[in-house]
UniProtKB/Swiss-Prot annotation:
NCBIfam families: murG. It comes from Actinobacillus pleuropneumoniae serotype 3 (strain JL03). UDP-N-acetyl-alpha-D-glucosamine binds at T12, G13, G14, N124, R160, S188, I239, A258, L259, T260, V261, C262, E263, Q283. Gene3D superfamilies: Glycogen Phosphorylase B (3.40.50.2000). This is UDP-N-acetylglucosamine--N-acetylmuramyl-(pentapeptide) pyrophosphoryl-undecaprenol N-acetylglucosamine transferase. Pathway: Cell wall biogenesis; peptidoglycan biosynthesis.
Length: 351
């Protein structure tokens, strides 16, 4: 009889995509997978598209909520735990994998109540609040970066297989000349500061670069017109084939979410990171994983002006060898076996 895994992950691609990579790895080994999520977040559409059945509980975050919501929170959490417990009782999983998002909290508590082993994976350099709580009841805690939990095994972030299969950067870059291909990602929601600043710099860089700019939903206005005028770039709300985009690129300018940092390492690309300004400096610390190894440059959001970006870009554009060196250093920081290692731990811990 096939072993069963319940995956708890939701809210953002940074939680969902690594969890899908682990699910794929276990499916290859004959495991049955089911997902626990919430109806109003991205997993509701994304997970079924990958052929994985999903069950829903009702839960939302408490950050920024009013006093009324905080007073009701214990009842909402209790209700969500009971919903998750019912799903677990019916499904009878051999293990539960928590990959972050609000859904992991009630799901993890319910799994513990049902005597099902809980394995956690923290994607960021700073542990999320839900994972900090769940780490006290989990049988194993894994992490992408060495800074989230002091004694947890570092496995990296599971990324899509097609990224790890890209040719080594020194081979990809060997015959390239000009223009320098720059991939710009404002994130799925779009990062206004990146979307405003990069096109302004494009005006000054001329034919030395060609820019492929993912602006995020509803953010094409203004950006597209600038690239049409300069003739050295294109803009799109989304890029469907990220493996092809990474293969094409010589340099990436983007935020430094955990998954993005690990994808860039897997692809072997130099990066300019503009960390989102979390209170806990989460994205900044993610970015240091590559920046400290000489594979990336960090520009803080308040410093990300057209002139600062131009000053950083010009020496890189003038020296292809430097770009190749940074790309090789990025690839050296990759963890291509992360999904396999998480799957191994789940198999070890399954009841």
């Amino acid at each position: 009889m096939a072993k069963k895994l319940l995956v708890m992950a939701g809210g953002t691609g940074g939680h969902v995509f690594p969890a899908i990579a682990v699910a794929r790895e276990l499916q290859k080994q004959g495991w049955e997978i089911r997902w626990l999520g919430t109806k109003d977040r991205m997993e509701a559409d994304l997970v079924p598209k990958h052929g994985i059945p999903i069950e829903f509980i009702q839960i939302s975050g408490l950050k920024g909520k009013g006093i009324g919501a905080l007073l009701k929170a214990p009842f909402a959490i209790f209700k969500a735990v009971m919903q998750a417990r019912k799903i677990i009782k019916n499904y009878q999983p051999d293990a539960v994998l928590g990959m972050g998002g609000y859904v992991s909290g009630p799901g993890g508590i319910a799994a513990k109540l049902c005597g099902v082993p809980v394995i956690l994976h923290e994607q960021n350099a700073v542990a999320g609040l839900t994972n900090v709580w769940l780490s006290k009841i989990a049988c194993r805690v894994l992490q992408a970066f060495p800074t989230a939990f002091p004694n947890a095994e570092v496995v990296g972030n599971p990324v899509r297989e097609d990224l790890a299969q890209l040719e080594a950067p020194e081979i990809r870059f060997a015959e390239r000349g000009y223009p320098i291909n720059i991939l710009v990602m404002g994130g799925s929601q779009g990062a206004r500061v990146i979307n405003q600043t990069v096109p302004e710099v494009a005006k000054q860089l001329g034919n030395n670069v060609f820019i492929s700019h993912q602006v995020g939903k509803g953010n094409l206005g203004g950006v597209e017109e600038i690239y049409q005028a300069t003739g050295n770039g294109i803009a799109a709300e989304f890029i469907d084939d990220m493996a092809q985009a990474y293969s094409w690129a010589d340099l990436v300018i983007c935020r430094s979410g955990a998954l993005t940092v690990c994808e860039i390492a897997a692809a072997g690309l130099p990066a300019i990171f503009v960390p989102y300004q979390h209170k806990d400096r989460q994205q900044y610390l993610n970015a240091t994983y590559l920046a400290d190894g000489g594979a990336a440059i960090i520009i803080e959001q308040q410093d990300f002006t057209p002139q600062t970006l131009l000053n950083v870009l010009q020496p890189l554009i003038a020296d292809r060898r430097k770009l190749t060196e940074m790309a090789v250093k990025a690839r050296a920081k990759a963890t291509p076996t992360a999904a396999q290692r998480v799957a191994e731990v789940i198999i070890e811990q399954a009841k």
